[in-house]
Amino acid sequence: MKGGKAIASGSYGCVFKPALLCEGDTERKKDYITKVMYHSYADLELKEMKMVGDVLKEIPDGDKYFLVNNITRCRFSELDGDDVKGRKNKCSGAFDKSLTDREFNLKINKGLITGINIPYGGKDLLDTIGPNLTSKTFININKGIINLIKNGIVKFNKKKLLHLDIKHMNMLYNPKDKNVRLIDWGICAKYTNDVVTEGVKDRNLM
C-alpha cells in the first residue's frame, strides 16, 4: 500500500490520508495528507501558498492559525487497489465520476494528475461538530476560533490580505494542540489603498 484512502474532496482536489508515497521517498510522510489534483491546479495552489506564506510569516505564531508551511509537490506512481478504494465517490467534486481507475492512472503517468503534501491539521469543523461533540471539545473549539480571529484573521486583514472563503469546511480543529487553523486560500486576494474590487464585494470580506 503506497498511501491512504480518499477521505474528502473539494472543487479542485481530493484528499488522501495517510499521504501517498512520493517519487524518491522510501516511506510516506507521517502526519501528512496528499491533495491529489490536476497539474495546472497544483501549480496555481503552490503559487498562491507562496504569496500567502510571504504575508503570514510576519504574523507571530502563525503556525497556530494557518496551514501554509511545509507544503511540497508530491509526484506519485499509479494508485493501487488500496489507494483507489472510495476514490470515485470521495473525489467526485474534483474528478468526474465516470473517470475509471485505469483512466485515472493513465493521467497520473502522463503527468496530468499530481499531488501536494500538506501537514495534517485535523478534521474540519463540519465533521468535528455533531451530536457526539463533548462540552469540553466545544469549549476548546470556541477558544480556538476566538484565537484564530484575534491573532490570525485580524492581523492578516491589516496586511491587506483577504481570505474570502472563511467557513466551517475551511477551518480545521486539532485535538492535540487544540488550535483551529484556516486552510484553502484558493480565492484569496490582496488589495491596495483600501479599495476592494467589485468582484469580491459580495463575499465574506475577511
Task: For the regions a language model picked out, list residue spans one by one.
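Conserved structural core of kinase catalytic domains
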Residues: G62-I141
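C-lobe/activation-segment region of protein kinase-like
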Residues: N179-M206
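ATP-binding glycine-rich loop module of kinase domains
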Residues: S11-A94
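Conserved N-terminal boundary motif of the eukaryotic protein kinase catalytic domain
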Residues: M1-A6
